[in-house]
Amino acid sequence: WIALAPFCGLLDWRPHIWVTGEHGAGKSDTVLEAIRVGMGSGHFISAKGSTTEAGLRQRLKCNAIPAVIDESEPNTNKDRLRLDGLLTLARNASSDDEAIAIKGTVSGEASSFRIRTMCCFASINPYIKELADQSRIAVLEIEKKPQTTATKDDFQTIKRNFLALDKLNFGTLFTNLMISRLPTLEANLLVFIEAAGDVLG
């Protein structure tokens, strides 16, 4: 996802992910930090759980930018309604033939948005109830490990590695590498699609 998301505007199909795990499993400190380091700050929209579909849509406009939405918890009816809107946006963004959103305005003139984002949701409880969303969103569950000296040492090693990569401006370097290999990426995507079709039907 980190490799593909910066090029979401070039893709015919844009998958999304939902990072989940119980409290203290390390969603923010590991996976979301890996996204920040791997893509580089400023190369994606970073939003919190109070974000609405309208807010994200207006922030995206016609720009092909990935979005990370942390704390996407479906705790209340209001939360679930808000997530329904965000999931509709993500669903429509998955394929180019569904990517045009037309909204009415108070002035009486329609406003058009071409939604070409790839979303990463993160929460303790994933909220994927529609079959259409299940085929578009991969759920990545983080297993919480017991607090031992070994696991604490591992976590500190991960943090040091992230810091070292960040100092090297790894996100920009990685994106530049992917740009230089776009023909290979496009060829590999076709292979992956064919292989996935054989497995998933």
Role assignments for model-derived ranges:
Residues 123-128:
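Short, polar loop motifs at secondary-structure junctions
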Residues 55-106:
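Conserved nucleotide-sensing/catalytic segment adjacent to the nucleotide-binding pocket
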Residues 60, 103-121:
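AAA+/SF3 P-loop NTPase mechanochemical coupling elements
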Residues 14-18, 66, 118:
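Residue-level preference for the first positions of well-ordered beta-strands
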Residues 30-34, 85-93, 116, 132-136:
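Alpha-helical scaffold elements adjacent to nucleotide-binding pockets in ATP/GTP-utilizing enzyme cores
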Residues 111-115, 130-201:
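Phosphate-sensing "switch" segment of ASCE/P-loop ATPases
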Residues 1-57, 61:
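P-loop NTPase catalytic core of nucleic-acid-dependent motor ATPases
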Residues 2, 34-35, 70, 120, ...:
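Conserved RecA-like P-loop NTPase ATPase core
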